């Protein structure tokens, strides 16, 4: 491939060892002008091992995904891309989206291409400047962190994989300039209350079953694109972050005499797709991924590893152990079943039965039968979209045997999100399980392990919402017509 620059023909050369592409036009320097000491930036070999690209070769090599400039979640730094194809492979293997067959760019914003990219050519969309702008405008900045964030962020600061760094992150966020720091497990508990109630209502009416979880925006986007016929099977509940944002902007601001127009809410997430979700659900003003927060902490030279542990602020403070396990595949299912059991029986689960271990694990599609009183619930858990097709086709065709299905886009659930620190791919499964185990361990240690037992949730319903599925709850915590992208251009 040749280009002209001021009468000079510019070429591209590919490293025969690692595939790195040297583009004379981008570098503004001919390959022949490079000194003998120059070496490949990727693998270090000499320039003599570079071959000039011809048309046929560039077609074979140009295998990176296209990222629309308006993509709300992911950005691509073109001059870092070496066309290795890892991003395409991730999208095809994990999502089942075959890029060569695309007639237009299809993206569910999950960021698994970001995780696969070794060159950092694909990154979560950087938006830290929006936080700085809000601070300069004198807004009250409020942060809330998702469960999976606290078991991954320590990895970037030399801590062991699976270290539970919640207290240190609260301290860091305060140093960054957040006036209040809340726990999204509170929003997860609220989601459980609404979702368990919705499931029981659907079971009683035998309507729109099976019910799918709806807190993963990449899964919702996938369903909208490939299975629009099943959208009425998705729970109408907003995600924990969606509910948390609404409660901060409404309940919390009202209780604390704050002007919600002068409050700036920031969700700290493992998930790139949340950047897309908040465009459709108001309440949260900004999403910063774990990798963005890591950059902010490092740029401010905060000694994260040696920070003291701080507590969350109260009134929308901490959640239960059930809210904590939302960050793991099967966690939403298990948390919802704990509360559904209580709502159906009016009795607490016995201590030795509170863990629904049948729904745990790393198998991409799992199923279980859960007996609650006279009801036997058939449930399924999916955490890799490429493996979801069989179950989704059954729901589409009206032949599904299930009552309740949890779907998470990323392997391992939120702990494997596109905005998390990258893992060595040869050890990824093992390291994801360490993150998951940290969440389950925190659940086991909590005094409150069921969402309905959280006193702050009880107070919220008594003071503000009334009861699950009330008119106010539906107005603030549910989507009337479930299409995240109904206003997409």
What are these regions (language model features)?
Residues 1-9:
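Short, Lys/Arg-enriched N-terminal segments with co-localized hydrophobic residues
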Residues 30-38, 55-63, 101-106, 126-137, ...:
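Short cysteine/histidine-rich metal-coordination sites, predominantly Zn2+-binding motifs
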Residues 5, 124-489:
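Iron-sulfur-associated redox domains of electron-transfer enzymes in respiratory
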Residues 12, 16-26, 41-56, 75-76, ...:
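Iron-sulfur cluster-binding cysteine motifs and their immediate structural context
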Residues 26-29, 55-56, 381-388:
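A short, sequence-level motif marking secondary-structure junctions
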Residues 72, 82, 108, 164-165, ...:
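Residue-level recognition of alpha-helix initiation/capping sites
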Residues 12, 18, 37, 46, ...:
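Non-ligating segments of multi-cofactor redox enzymes
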Residues 25-31, 66-72, 77, 96, ...:
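Short, intrinsically disordered, charge-biased short linear motifs at domain edges
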């Amino acid at each position: 491939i040749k280009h002209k620059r001021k009468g000079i023909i510019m070429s591209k050369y590919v490293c025969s060892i690692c595939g790195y592409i040297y583009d004379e036009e981008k570098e503004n320097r001919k390959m022949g002008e490079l000194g003998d000491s120059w070496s490949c930036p990727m693998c270090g070999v000499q320039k003599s091992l570079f071959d000039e690209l011809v048309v046929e070769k560039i077609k074979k090599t140009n295998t990176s995904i296209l990222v629309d400039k308006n993509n709300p979640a992911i950005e691509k730094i073109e001059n870092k891309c070496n066309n290795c194809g890892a991003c395409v492979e991730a999208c095809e293997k994990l999502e089942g989206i075959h890029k060569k067959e695309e007639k237009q760019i299809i993206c569910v914003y999950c960021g698994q291409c970001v995780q696969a990219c070794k060159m950092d050519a694909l990154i979560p969309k950087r938006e830290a400047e929006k936080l700085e702008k809000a601070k300069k405008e004198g807004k009250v900045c409020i942060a809330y962190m998702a469960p999976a964030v606290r078991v991954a962020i320590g990895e970037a600061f030399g801590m062991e994989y699976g270290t539970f760094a919640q207290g240190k992150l609260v301290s860091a966020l305060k140093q960054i300039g957040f006036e209040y720091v809340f726990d999204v497990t509170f929003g997860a508990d609220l989601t459980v209350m609404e979702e368990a109630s919705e499931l029981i209502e659907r079971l009683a009416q035998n309507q729109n079953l099976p019910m799918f979880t709806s807190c993963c925006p990449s899964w919702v986007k996938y369903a909208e694109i490939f299975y629009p016929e099943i959208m009425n099977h998705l729970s109408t509940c907003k995600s924990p972050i969606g509910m948390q944002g609404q409660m901060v902007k409404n309940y919390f601001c009202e209780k604390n005499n704050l002007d919600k127009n002068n409050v700036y809410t920031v969700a700290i997430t493992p998930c790139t797709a949340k950047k897309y979700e908040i465009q459709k659900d108001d309440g949260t003003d900004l999403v910063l991924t774990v990798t963005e927060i890591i950059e902010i902490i490092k740029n401010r030279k905060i000694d994260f590893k040696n920070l003291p542990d701080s507590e969350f602020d109260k009134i929308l403070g901490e959640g239960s152990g059930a809210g904590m396990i939302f960050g793991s595949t099967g966690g939403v299912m298990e948390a919802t079943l704990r509360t559904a059991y209580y709502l159906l029986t009016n009795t607490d689960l016995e201590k030795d039965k509170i863990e629904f271990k049948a729904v745990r694990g790393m198998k991409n599609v799992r199923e279980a039968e859960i007996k609650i009183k006279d009801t036997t619930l058939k449930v399924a858990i999916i955490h890799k979209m490429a493996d979801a097709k069989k179950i989704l086709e059954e729901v589409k065709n009206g032949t599904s045997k299930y009552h309740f299905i949890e779907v998470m886009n990323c392997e391992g659930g939120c702990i494997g999100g596109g905005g998390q620190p990258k893992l060595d791919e040869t050890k990824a499964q093992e390291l994801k399980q360490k993150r998951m185990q940290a969440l389950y361990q925190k659940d086991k240690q909590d005094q409150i392990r069921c969402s309905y037992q959280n006193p702050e949730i009880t107070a919220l319903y008594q003071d503000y919402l009334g009861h699950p599925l009330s008119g106010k709850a539906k107005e603030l915590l549910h989507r009337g017509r479930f299409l995240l992208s109904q206003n997409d251009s």
